């Protein structure tokens, strides 16, 4: 009887395992049925992503500065370039001045999936309690306000018409025009609204796709801006003691292919690791120049009555491309899945866009200048417990087949051990039965 019970349990275990594996197979076939862009992402077949990092030297800045500046960058305001030291955008005790650098588009500024790392330093007289005003990091489709002769009122009006209203001689956006289109990250070092100066420095992330009607409001520290502020829950706080008079890095990661934006900071005082400040996977499109398809990279700083020294030390730009493939593939679902795999392997971020979500994103990109309204593309930061839970669940799902394989191997080995024992018992019984039957025949 015990042999029958054991055999029944074994049969049930094998049946359950078989049904589960069949269910997994049918589910995959069903979910991917009709998907012409399906890319196999099984843990058994996926290795390193085909997407790799490619340095973009045209959109980068490093010592010595002058050669690169003369070739690929515009300089504005009171910027001072020290060839083997730094680019001083503003100088302490130099009131009501601004400085900026912005890529000129002569080099390669057609960037879609990319990482930009700005290295900078903000310093001031240690005896001074208050400093200002701050700095800005921009990715914009517009750089004509630095190149055109806008001395006459007619030239200014003509430029405003051609640029959808950009106010060329305004510097409210920490040195940039207040209605500059594109993505801009404001690092504010002085609180204009209210008297609580303990909150500085802080950061805000804005996007402007309608410069004729939207702008950044410096007097309210961005609070009354009509440009869309992505961090709608309040200012993003920065560490004052780690920022002042120290080398700091700000990293922008943007993958247009899967609509992913992430902003990190690295304080030299605290170590060689990144701290996430902002992240969103909402359908967020950074506008490109309508004529060239380029995005220009810039950095600026502004002094008011209060002053500080802002130095730009390095700009490092890398693009992400599929190895040895035409750029047209970067608009396909195949590439999107490879980009997700690259994002997971390179930055530890897990995304899983479905085909219908990808199709919706392509439709949004086809109409990039439609305003997203007041609804925020709110960040899904690492501080959000739901985001962490989602990543854990998604990671477990990605590797569920490996877990099933391990379970299958275990059950298979258990089956082998059971059969070996049964076989030994059967052999021993046969031997005993054979030994009892041997003897003399009756007379």
Swiss-Prot record:
Signal peptide residues on this chain, from the entry's feature table: 1-27
Record GO biological process: endoplasmic reticulum to Golgi vesicle-mediated transport
Subcellular location: Nucleus membrane
Residue spans crossing the bilayer: 399-420
Coiled-coil parts of chain: none
InterPro entries reported for this sequence: ConA-like_dom_sf (IPR013320), Intracellular_Lectin-GPT (IPR051136), Lectin_leg (IPR005052)
Membrane topology: Single-pass type I membrane protein
Main location: nucleus
Residue numbers on the Cytoplasmic membrane side: 421-443
GO cellular component, one term: Golgi membrane
Perinuclear space side of membrane: 28-398
Pfam families the record matches: Lectin_leg-like
Additional information: Present with 319 molecules/cell in log phase SD medium.
Protein name as annotated: Protein UIP5
Organism encoding this protein: Saccharomyces cerevisiae (strain ATCC 204508 / S288c) (Baker's yeast)
Gene expressing this chain: UIP5
């Amino acid at each position: 009887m015990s042999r029958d019970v054991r055999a029944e349990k074994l049969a049930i275990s094998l049946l359950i395992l078989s049904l589960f594996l069949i269910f997994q197979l049918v589910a995959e076939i069903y979910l991917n049925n009709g998907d012409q862009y399906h890319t196999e992402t099984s843990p058994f077949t996926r290795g390193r992503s085909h997407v790799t990092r490619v340095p973009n030297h045209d959109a980068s800045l490093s010592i010595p500065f002058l050669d690169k500046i003369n070739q690929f960058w515009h300089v504005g305001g009171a910027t001072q370039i020290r060839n083997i030291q730094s680019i001083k955008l503003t100088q302490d005790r130099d009131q009501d001045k601004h400085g900026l650098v912005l890529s000129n588009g002569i080099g390669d500024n057609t960037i879609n999936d990319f990482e930009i790392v700005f290295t900078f330093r903000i310093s001031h007289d240690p005896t001074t309690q208050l400093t200002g005003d701050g700095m800005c990091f921009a990715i914009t489709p517009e750089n004509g306000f630095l190149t055109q002769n806008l001395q006459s009122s007619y030239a200014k009006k003509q430029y405003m018409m051609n640029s959808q209203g950009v106010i060329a001689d305004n510097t409210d956006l920490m040195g940039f025009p207040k209605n500059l289109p594109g993505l801009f990250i404001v690092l504010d070092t002085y609180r204009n609204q209210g008297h609580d100066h303990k909150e500085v420095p802080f950061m805000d992330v804005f996007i402007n796709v309608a410069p004729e009607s939207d702008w950044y409001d410096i007097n309210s520290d961005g609070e009354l801006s009509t440009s869309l502020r992505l961090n709608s829950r309040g200012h993003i706080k920065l560490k004052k003691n780690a920022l002042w008079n120290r080398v700091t890095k700000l990293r922008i990661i943007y993958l247009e292919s899967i609509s992913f934006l992430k902003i990190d900071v690295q304080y030299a005082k605290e170590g060689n690791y990144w701290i996430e400040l902002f992240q969103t996977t909402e359908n967020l499109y950074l506008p490109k120049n309508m004529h060239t398809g380029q995005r220009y990279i810039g950095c600026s700083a502004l002094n008011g009555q209060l002053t500080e020294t802002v130095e730009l030390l390095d700009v490092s730009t890398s693009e992400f491309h599929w190895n040895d493939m035409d750029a047209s593939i970067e608009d396909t679902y195949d590439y999107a899945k490879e980009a997700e795999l690259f994002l997971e392997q390179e930055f530890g971020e897990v995304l899983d866009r479905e085909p219908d979500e990808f199709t919706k994103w392509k439709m949004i990109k086809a109409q990039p200048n439609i305003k997203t309204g007041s609804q925020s593309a709110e960040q899904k930061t690492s501080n959000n417990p739901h985001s962490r839970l989602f990543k854990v669940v998604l990671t477990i799902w990605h590797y569920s087949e490996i877990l099933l394989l391990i379970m299958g191997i275990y059950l298979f080995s258990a089956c082998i051990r059971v059969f070996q024992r049964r076989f030994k018992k059967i052999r021993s019984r046969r031997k005993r039965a054979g030994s009892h039957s041997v003897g003399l025949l009756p007379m």
